[in-house]
């Protein structure tokens, strides 16, 4: 009936403008992309920490669960901020102002550098939980960054073992303690400058990840 009558694009329709269908990119090269990715990671960590603080205030998580999660986020925050810190961003306060990030509870945790459950007493249970989480992550991060010399790994691993020993709540046969002990024995048979080979690094990462997950399961039990 209307053969031959051209269709009229609706109001606001792009019509024949292919440029309007092109993907808009925030970056021009790989360096800029990494910069934005790093800022996004820092933004996400701060927002997650703010949500965790609110959840703890509302009794949605137990003190042990909160302590472990907050300790992990503080480690992640430090790593994320190092990637962003520079001439444009000199402090976390400046980052929050620039991106209108209103997270006062998270900022308080970051400035105190410890979960709210932790006291100054090193024998405090929550202090031990925080230290165990932090040390697990520190050792695994070193291995992922190919830091594998005996004298660079053993001190943190020994401190991890000693901290777990201070936790009387951990059962004597806790698998994570046994895993760390076995790797300490392996490292003690090496010279300071000796390095773990690729196979050992892969196995150690697997073992520590399993031990870390077991520790988290213990906290949630």
Swiss-Prot record:
It comes from the Eukaryota. GO terms for biological process: endosome transport via multivesicular body sorting pathway; negative regulation of protein ubiquitination; positive regulation of protein catabolic process; positive regulation of ubiquitin-dependent endocytosis; protein transport; ubiquitin-dependent protein catabolic process via the multivesicular body sorting pathway. Transmembrane segments: none annotated. One of its GO terms (molecular function) is ubiquitin binding. Component of the ESCRT-I complex (endosomal sorting complex required for transport I) which consists of TSG101, VPS28, a VPS37 protein (VPS37A to -D) and MVB12A or MVB12B in a 1:1:1:1 stoichiometry. Interacts with TSG101, VPS37B, VPS37C, MVB12A and MVB12B. Component of an ESCRT-I complex (endosomal sorting complex required for transport I) which consists of TSG101, VPS28, VPS37A and UBAP1 in a 1:1:1:1 stoichiometry. Interacts with VPS36; the interaction mediates the association with the ESCRT-II complex. Interacts with SNF8 and VPS25. Interacts with CEP55. Belongs to the VPS28 family. This is Vacuolar protein sorting-associated protein 28 homolog. It comes from Mus musculus. The lineage of its organism: Eukaryota, Metazoa, Chordata, Craniata, Vertebrata. The gene is Vps28.
